Amino acid sequence: MVKNSFISVIPQEEKNKGSVEFQVFSFTNKIRKLTSHLELHRKDYSSQIGLRRILGKRQRLLAYLSKKNRVRYKELIDQLGIREPKTR
């Protein structure tokens, strides 16, 4: 399973499924699944709303992690292959 492959990559003390890194990883997987679903079903508006909601949650978690621990934030962004959000 995808979650188990990520858990083996992160350090032993961070195997907590409630950790910020794991939550961001989980949201990223959901985002990728919803994106591929929406490519086939463009008019699925409830899925679009769900995607926007998950994107917002992930963005808030990434902002929190970047404030608390910039090194872990950079590692996570590189590992997941997501862009750093634009700052205002």
Swiss-Prot record:
Give the chief site where it resides. plastid
Keywords (A to Z) from UniProt? Chloroplast, Plastid, Ribonucleoprotein, Ribosomal protein
BP-aspect Gene Ontology terms:
translation
- Gene Ontology CC entries for this record: chloroplast; ribonucleoprotein complex; ribosome
Q: Which residues form a coiled coil?
A: none
Keyword check for Plastid: yes
Task: Spell out the subunit comment.
Answer: Part of the 30S ribosomal subunit.
Tell me the PANTHER family matching this sequence: RIBOSOMAL PROTEIN S15, BACTERIAL AND ORGANELLAR, SMALL RIBOSOMAL SUBUNIT PROTEIN US15M
Protein name from the UniProt record: Small ribosomal subunit protein uS15c
**Source organism per UniProt:** Calycanthus floridus var. glaucus
